Structure formats: C-alpha cells, structure tokens
Amino acid sequence: MPSAPDAPAAPDAAASVAPNPPAALPVTVRWLGETPYDACFDAMRAFTDARTPDTDDEIWVVEHPPVYTLGQAGNPAHLLVADSGVPLVKVDRGGQITYHGPGQIVAYLLVDLRRRKLMVRTLVTRIEEAVIETLAAYNLASARKAGAPGIYVESGPHRGAKIAALGLKIRNGCSYHGLSVNVKMDLRPFLAINPCGYAGLETIDMASLGATADWHEVAQTLVRRLIAHLDGATAAAALPQQALEQSND
C-alpha cells in the first residue's frame, strides 16, 4: 500500500501577508475662488519652474471671469467672433480653443509624474475617469470620445455634447493646466468658437441636463475623485474636511 503523500508545508506567515500599498503622496488642495486667468497661468508656471523633487503635488480649484484660451498648436480661426468682448489668451497647454467663465469648475493639476511613476496618457485617463465618476454621482452618464479629448454626454437628447474639457502641459516631468467641468453657466460664449477645434460641437452644462447640485458641492466631489485616482480611494476618504473647505490661499 503506497504511503500517504506528505502534507503540504504551511505557508510562511510573513509571505502570506499582502504587502502594504505604497504610501499616498501628499496633495495640497487650494481653493482660489474667482481668479483672473492670467494670474493663475503665471502662478502655475512659476510653481512648476520652482518645484523640487520634494515639492508636494497640488490641485488648484478656481472659477475664472470670462476668457477664451488657445492652446499652443491652436488655430485662431476657431474663434469665430473676433469682437465678442471676451479676451483671448494664448497658452502653452495642448489642445485648441476653449472658454472659461462663471459657473464652471476649473481644476489645475500640478503633479510630478516621475515621482508618481505615471505616463502622460495614464494621468489623462485618470483625470477623465475622475470626471466621469463625478458626473455619475449626479446621475449623468458620460464618456470619452476617441480622438477628441474631454468628456461627452453619453445618452439623451444632448448625446455627444461636451461637458468637460482637458488640456495639460508637461515641463520637466511635471504637469500643469488641467480640466474644466461645466456646472451651471452661460453657454452662449461657446457659440463664438469651435470648441476644442470642432465646428458645430454642442457644449452643455450639468444644470441643462437636470443636475441641481451647486458649484461647491460638485467641486468637492471632483477633488475627492481626482485624489482617489492619483492616490487611491483610501487617500480620498482620508482627505481632511478642511481640505475641501473654500478658502482663498
């Protein structure tokens, strides 16, 4: 009669313990209120140029007075009404022309990609996911569109309308610029441009789709989702409440 097989060895206790996830990297959230675009543009370039390997990443949340911005490869012909009264600022982000104004959340992501071991495409994907999840929190279905950066309404009579824009600049391995989400705003200035270079592209806001949340609530949701996609859900859940409170730093 063959002998019984040896019992399998008990696993090493140390080997059976899942490794701890890497510690979340600090992210400072700054609530800048309503700030002129030029001031933010100059400040984020200065911040990026001055940062060191030890500088914490930051997210700046802001609302701009009316302004058009044209990306570094942008075509000025996409501004259809030259005398609209809204200033045009040429900037160094990717993308074409877009509009910023009251009722829109703008979030600038000042992130050290090398320290986080992120490729640019990965960062863009995580930002897009954060926006999609933010909109879903208000029962708005949205999605990416191949070859057209930003987030678009996924269903209903406004299917295909753009509700969020995205454009980054990478300098010395660090990002600046970021994204915008239309909450409740005057959409007429978008009619004077080809948004992001697409003639006839409809632009929509959350209020027009039936969402009643205010700017501050949506901004807080967005910040949590951005941090969750940078550092994980645990880091987002642990974000202190004061980090989500409005202040002018």
From Swiss-Prot:
Active site as annotated: C196
PROSITE patterns recorded: BPL_LPL_CATALYTIC, LIPB
Other remarks in the entry: In the reaction, the free carboxyl group of octanoic acid is attached via an amide linkage to the epsilon-amino group of a specific lysine residue of lipoyl domains of lipoate-dependent enzymes.
Function summary: Catalyzes the transfer of endogenously produced octanoic acid from octanoyl-acyl-carrier-protein onto the lipoyl domains of lipoate-dependent enzymes. Lipoyl-ACP can also act as a substrate although octanoyl-ACP is likely to be the physiological substrate.
Molecular function per GO: lipoyl(octanoyl) transferase activity
Protein name as it appears in the record: Octanoyltransferase
Site annotation Lowers pKa of active site Cys: residues: K162
Gene giving rise to this polypeptide: lipB
UniProt record similarity statement: Belongs to the LipB family.
InterPro entries, sorted: aa-tRNA-synth_II/BPL/LPL, BPL_LPL_catalytic, Octanoyltransferase, Octanoyltransferase_CS
Catalyzed reactions per annotation: octanoyl-[ACP] + L-lysyl-[protein] = N(6)-octanoyl-L-lysyl-[protein] + holo-[ACP] + H(+)
Domain of life: Bacteria
Locations listed in the record: Cytoplasm
Enzyme class of the recorded protein, top EC level: transferase
The keyword Cytoplasm is assigned to this record: yes
Pathway: Protein modification; protein lipoylation via endogenous pathway; protein N(6)-(lipoyl)lysine from octanoyl-[acyl-carrier-protein]: step 1/2
PANTHER family from the UniProt entry: LIPOYLTRANSFERASE 2, MITOCHONDRIAL-RELATED, OCTANOYLTRANSFERASE
Keyword set, alphabetical order: Acyltransferase, Cytoplasm, Transferase
Gene Ontology CC, one term: cytoplasm
Sites where the protein binds substrate: R93, G94, G95, Q96, I97, T98, Y99, H100, A165, L166, G167, G178, L179, S180
